[in-house]
From Swiss-Prot:
CDD domains: SmpB
Recorded name of the encoding gene: smpB
This protein's record includes keyword Cytoplasm: yes
Keywords: Cytoplasm, RNA-binding
PROSITE patterns for this protein: SSRP (PS01317)
Xref: HAMAP family: SmpB
Record region (Disordered): 133-160
Protein name: SsrA-binding protein
Similarity annotation: Belongs to the SmpB family.
SUPFAM superfamilies with a match to the protein in the record: Small protein B (SmpB)
Pfam families: SmpB (PF01668)
Amino acid sequence: MAPKGSQRVVNKIVAENRKARFNYEIIDTYEAGLVLTGTEVKSLREGKANIAESYASDEGDEIWLINSHLPEYLQANRFNHEPRRRRKLLLNKREINRLRAGINRDGMTLVPLKVYFNEKGRAKLELALAKGKKLHDKRETEKERDWNRQKSRLLKGNSQ
């Protein structure tokens, strides 16, 4: 229990997959719990996780996070965890069925967006059902961003 007067950081983002929003069109997002060992939680709290090349896969009645990197906890001894092991995601049966139906559609995939600690101190993963963008879609998004930036500069310049 935290001592009185101390403030817990709410929704502290530990790792973020920034490229996912550029490479994929996000259709729907879900919040999933992570099954972690003690040393993995300690390593996460240090903020050294990497989910840039990771993805989620549906196997049987479960969803697994694959290829995420949680480095070993330095203060741990022989009971340390494997950095790139598969981690089970905790979702409701209804959510798993919805995700499975989404994956079975053409071009859909499960992409992790960010790992964070919620207000109860639990490690959570924001998971997105997404569709891969084509090269011309990425260029169009980039042009739109540039135009919005220019527009805001022009409006800012006119208001002075």
